[in-house]
């Protein structure tokens, strides 16, 4: 039996998703909780391996288990064993050909910036702080050259292990909601640190450090050293993973909860 679950987590206190010996990770916490429910060892596969400090509102995972458990038991049972900053939101039994990573057709991230003169207290681990005034309209304008299929060498980390720098960005939008500036970006897949490096470049444009046309110059250069600093991890959220309709996965509100849909 193959089960898919949607998981939400605050990544502030974790060394990313992927299990690593001697480190506190999301995957280890989730597998521990599910193994308790199954009364046997469970290994999970996720849609997107988020980095240290990165959050998710709708991470999708799957696992195989022959134990007879209802979806309600998987959800509520796992939540009873999970730490308070991780929860299972939804679940469904899936066909054997479903794969949380390889069946996905797109992934959507949001990068949230608190743009105010004073650093935030309550949201300090959940947003990136920029005290310089950002013009979200310039950021939106600059980001449009990244749409479509491109070589994103300038926006990948030096540790990126992908065989190709080619990715296809389906949509990129920058909006302002009071003091919050939100980068919303969807692509078929992302390179290591790609969203954070795009955010760094657009922040440089929004603050007036570079002109709008500089974004395209960085893209065309295919050189990571010519871009901006990588934006911090704690403003980044995996908010949606899209699959073919045949799988019937619920599309939850992207979130995070302190944002609203426009």
Swiss-Prot record:
Alphabetically ordered keywords of this record: Isomerase, tRNA processing
EC number: 5.4.99.12
Residue positions binding substrate: 109
UniProt xrefs under InterPro entries: PsdUridine_synth_cat_dom_sf, PsdUridine_synth_TruA, PsdUridine_synth_TruA_a/b_dom, PsdUridine_synth_TruA_C, TruA/RsuA/RluB/E/F_N
PANTHER family reported in the protein's UniProt record: PSEUDOURIDYLATE SYNTHASE (PTHR11142), TRNA PSEUDOURIDINE SYNTHASE-LIKE 1 (PTHR11142:SF0)
Assembly and interaction partners: Homodimer.
Primary role: Formation of pseudouridine at positions 38, 39 and 40 in the anticodon stem and loop of transfer RNAs.
Annotated protein name in UniProt: tRNA pseudouridine synthase A
Originating species: Legionella pneumophila (strain Lens)
Gene field: truA
